[in-house]
Swiss-Prot record:
It comes from Arabidopsis thaliana. The gene is GUX1. This is UDP-glucuronate:xylan alpha-glucuronosyltransferase 1. Its cofactor is Mn(2+). The record marks 400 as: Important for catalytic activity. It comes from the Eukaryota.
């Protein structure tokens, strides 16, 4: 129980062992003496089990063995009773409150290390932070020891000279030891409920006091040397604090006060609700409606936050303040993918704004194509990943943090530029930050995620950029370290084009059927591996690579090209292939032929019209194969002239913004 330091387990000793050590004859003497006193109505103290004072009044004719039998039992009971009273008198405040203010059971156990914080509180910071509160000072305290609770009493009295007790000790039972982070965030759950109904582990609810609290104060554990953001005790305490705060009646909004080295859960206690921070002290005044909605969510990804079958619920927000967004940084090869993604969103029936973040490396020509597809251009300054090597693929992917600066929107559905929206997903705007599908382990996939733009969240991400380690070196890993309390949406809303090594034939068949289903069953199809527009349309070129073959499927490949063909003709040019890419495709095909890959895709004759279209100065791509891999000179932009921007109808577009 939080607020419940160690208490020794009582050991009850009976007289059974003593009786076994007595001889039968002595036992008989004692029994006869006991019956004689009972019949004679003599000294009644002989049969009173708790009469442990007047030893001298015992019958002097009794055998010493009788004294041994009964008086030792009495002595042991006296010791037990004394120990119990001592424990009650000197126990932590949590027990006194439990005994006097609730029917909670006594909990004889050591403090759970998951809830323990060794932080020395800076009471000067506490006092100065409390100056931001004008309301009364009835304080609910959680997870403090008895000395700290006494200090809270002193703090409350320093502002109020009344005699009324201003501190209420809150009780919270610990979560069971088997409630681990992996149990709360399993890698897989049976979303379709084919064999079982996913159920989250039970976490004890806090008992909400009947008395109104102006301030809820909580001491949070933070083990900086470990995986502090994935801590069951830390999560449990914050959910308990949110529960008490959300229980306020009427229009009253209390404050929540954390003492912790580490920042609270940013999508539970939002930085926009942060009133003050001093050192390890955090004071919030949360929006209670928002808090109540979030408390209706499952405690982890162990259950779907948006069950299958109820995806048609409308968003309650303002559609003009909701948008789809993606980002391109230094990667013109994804322009075609972003254009196709925009086309798929419009085909799904959504009319929400489309916002794309680009940096200065995206040319005016490519910007014109994006605008023609419906994207509103926002120019950004790139953010370098400080842990990435120069020119590495992940060098600039922290630029994704700029999404939180889109504060002219309340909700953003971020989508990667390599996916298609097959069915309308506007209902996801009703979901909180961060809502996403599972990836591996306890992590979410950031390819589709709901976020709530806020400048202070952006600042939070930037403040820890040198401190937080990304598991994969990229933005997805970083965001998973910050937003550990994420909410699972069905995998059909970000279905990966991928056949796992462990997939059996039946699983592969089901996936293939999903890829090609008409009308679509999947909401979003996410193209991993070599992208469709970088292959010829004749077949999925992932088949020609032993590295990428797990991403190969002609069915999903054709699905993408159907969307491409529905795009305005003027946008097709943004999907043309450079000569170097044609050389790469031929190189992979020859490798597959040499290895005699059984699928036989390397035998298919290419009929894609783009095969004969040259957009650079290196049209003889076959000559490149003679020197393949020798140098990188074919990447020079001088070999790829930039065409003039196409004409765009801007009547339906908003002015661009810079971030």
């Amino acid at each position: 129980m939080a607020n419940s330091p160690a208490a020794p387990a009582p050991t009850t000793t009976t007289g059974g062992d003593s009786r076994r050590r007595l001889s039968a004859s002595i036992e008989a003497i004692c029994k006869r003496r006991f019956r004689r006193n009972s019949k004679g109505g003599g000294r009644s103290d002989m049969v009173k089990p708790f009469n442990i004072i007047n030893f001298s009044t015992q019958d002097k004719n009794s055998s010493c063995c009788c004294f041994t039998k009964f008086q030792i039992v009495k002595l042991l009971l006296f010791i037990l009773l004394s120990a119990t009273l001592f424990t009650i008198i000197y126990s932590p405040e949590a027990y006194h409150h439990s005994l006097s203010h609730s029917s909670s059971r006594w909990i004889w156990r050591r403090q759970d290390p998951r809830y323990f914080s060794d932080l020395d509180i800076n009471w000067d910071d506490v006092t100065k932070t409390l100056e931001n509160i004008e309301e009364g000072r009835t304080i609910g305290v959680l997870n403090f020891d008895s000395n700290e609770i006494q200090r809270w009493r002193e703090v409350s009295k320093s502002k109020d000279n009344g005699d009324e007790e201003k501190v209420v000790v809150l009780n919270l039972d610990y979560a069971d030891k088997n409630v681990t982070w992996d149990a709360l965030y399993p890698e897989w759950i049976d979303e379709e409920q084919e064999t079982e109904v996913p159920v989250c582990p039970n976490i004890p609810n806090i008992k909400v006091p009947t008395r109104r609290l102006d301030l809820i104060v909580v001491k949070l554990p933070c083990r900086k040397e470990g995986n502090w953001s994935r801590d069951v005790g830390r999560l449990h305490l914050q959910l308990a604090a949110a529960t008490v705060a959300a229980s306020a009646k009427g229009f009253f909004r209390g404050h929540v006060f954390f003492v912790s080295r580490c920042f609270p859960i940013p999508n539970l206690f939002r930085c926009k609700d942060l009133v003050s921070r001093r050192g390890d002290v955090w004071l919030y005044k949360p929006n209670l409606d928002t808090l109540r909605d979030k408390l209706q969510l499952p405690v982890g990804s162990c259950e779907l936050s948006l069950p299958l079958g109820i995806q048609d619920r409308p968003s309650l927000g303002n559609p003009k303040r909701e948008a789809y967004a993606t980002i391109l940084h230094s990667a013109h090869v994804y322009v075609c993918g972003a254009i196709a993604a925009a086309q798929s969103i419009r085909q799904s029936g959504s009319t929400r704004d489309l916002v794309i973040l680009v940096d200065d490396n995206i040319s005016g020509y490519h910007r014109s194509g994006l605008e023609a597809a419906g994207w509103q251009i926002r120019t950004i300054q790139r953010i370098r990943n400080p842990k990435a090597e120069k020119d590495a693929y992940n060098e600039w992917n922290y630029s994704k943090f700029r999404l939180w600066q889109l504060t002219d929107y309340d909700k953003i559905i971020f989508i990667d530029a390599d996916l298609l929206i097959l069915r309308n997903i506007d209902f996801l705007f009703s979901m909180p930050e961060i809502s996403a599908t599972g990836n591996n382990g306890t992590l979410f996939n950031s390819g589709v995620m709901v976020i709530e733009p806020c400048n202070c969240t952006f600042q939070l991400l930037m403040e820890h950029i040198n401190e937080i380690e990304s598991y994969n070196g990229g933005d997805q890993g970083y965001l998973n370290e910050v937003f550990t309390w994420w909410h699972r949406i069905p995998k059909h809303m970000n279905f990966l084009k991928h056949f796992w090594i462990g997939d059996e034939d039946d699983a592969k068949r089901k996936k293939t059927e999903l890829f090609g289903a008409e009308p679509p069953v999947l909401y979003v199809l996410h193209y991993l591996g070599m992208k469709p527009w970088l292959c010829y349309r004749d077949y999925d070129c992932n088949f020609n690579s032993d590295i990428f073959v797990e991403f190969a499927t002609d069915i999903a490949h054709r699905k993408w090209w159907m969307v491409h063909d529905a795009m305005p003709q003027e946008l097709h040019q943004f999907c043309y292939l450079r000569s170097k890419q044609k050389a790469q495709l031929e190189y992979d095909r020859r490798q597959a032929e040499a290895a005699n890959y059984a699928d036989g895709h390397w035998k298919i004759r290419v009929k894609d019209p783009r095969f004969k279209i040259c957009i650079d100065k290196l049209c003889n791509w076959k000559s490149m194969l003679r020197h393949w891999g020798e140098s990188n000179w074919t990447d020079y932009e001088s070999f790829v002239p930039t065409p003039p921007a196409i004409t765009v109808d801007r009547r339906s577009s908003l002015p661009g913004h810079n971030l």
